């Protein structure tokens, strides 16, 4: 059932050294390709790399696990093994609200496919654009909007019920806990 895949598609920040296959990467982008798009604009474009040297440079351009304590943050050996850079043309006529709506839908589809293929992902909006656009050799006419890191996850992620609306994620006993609000608190009556 798709709900199980959604529950299992979590943000991962620690990865093995296994390099993702080109075939699997293209399947992930195919998931994004078939996403719904505001006015069927389909304005998103995807760059990716699994090159070790580039991935090392790109890792320095993101902060993984900003809320986590230093001792449970990923080590350099646990860095992502791949990066997607999602971009739009600078002269797009789409308002940002639609760009980010499309981006969210496409990113979720890409991450769902990645999880199904055995990869973990983490969608990142706070990254060093200059570093990413240079390392990924993004053509001048494009503006990057998001990063998705990926690889074979080595961290364990567990969904737990939020208590008193506390939703900050944390690591306890080596397991990454992600509090989720109860269903009845999400419904406006």
Predicted regions and their residues:
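Acidic, surface-exposed loops and disordered segments
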Residues: 1-189
